[in-house]
Amino acid sequence: DGKRAGEHSAIFYRTDKFEVLEHGDFWLSEITDRPNKGWDAVLPRICTWGEFRDKQTGFTFLFFNLHMDHVGVQARAESAKLILEKIKEFPKKLPAILTGDFNVDQTSESYQLLDGSGIMRDSYEIADFRYAPNGTFNGFHPDRKTDSRIDHLFLTKEFEVKKYGILTDTYRSEAKESARKEQN
């Protein structure tokens, strides 16, 4: 249900720095308000969102975290379109951050839909400094080297990225992605 069982895409944040003003989930499918498989997806997939306020500066932004289907090509493309629509639907036109396991690399249709939307930009592409000796997909083989990035961090134009890094010396099979974001 996205809360106590099944798929969930948590957003971890510093409670001493940020306040959550509003939050929720929606399912990556034609029916967004309850768990279900969308389009050609193999599993129900979810996107969690929050509206955050920086306690010190008052800067307010949206944060989305998702997990796209690992098989359904149509599901991933439609999920990308759905995310863009959800961002546009918010009554306040706030800056937005979109992260997650997209289950496809930077050459895929769903990636291109997001990065070419004019709304979201890949933090990897716009970073002033990039540390990425390896991609984020290794097929569960930690020693495999690849340029393939399946975990992405997209931003709206209000953000600039000073430093971007893919940290492959973690305990996970899929590497963490890190970008230092600053609003203009």
Stretches found by the model and what they are:
Residues 1-60, 165-167:
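Structured beta-strand-rich core segments of catalytic domains in phosphoester-bond hydrolases
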Residues 3-4, 72-74:
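Solvent-exposed loop/turn segments connecting transmembrane beta-strands
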Residues 6, 44-45, 77, 81, ...:
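A structural signal for well-ordered alpha-helical segments within the folded catalytic domains
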Residues 17, 74, 78, 87-96, ...:
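Metal-dependent phosphoester-hydrolase catalytic domains
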Residues 53, 82-89:
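A generic secondary-structure signal
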Residues 63, 96-98:
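Hydrophobic/aromatic residues located in beta-strands of well-ordered beta-sheets
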Residues 66-68, 100-102:
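Active-site metal-binding loops of divalent metal-dependent hydrolases
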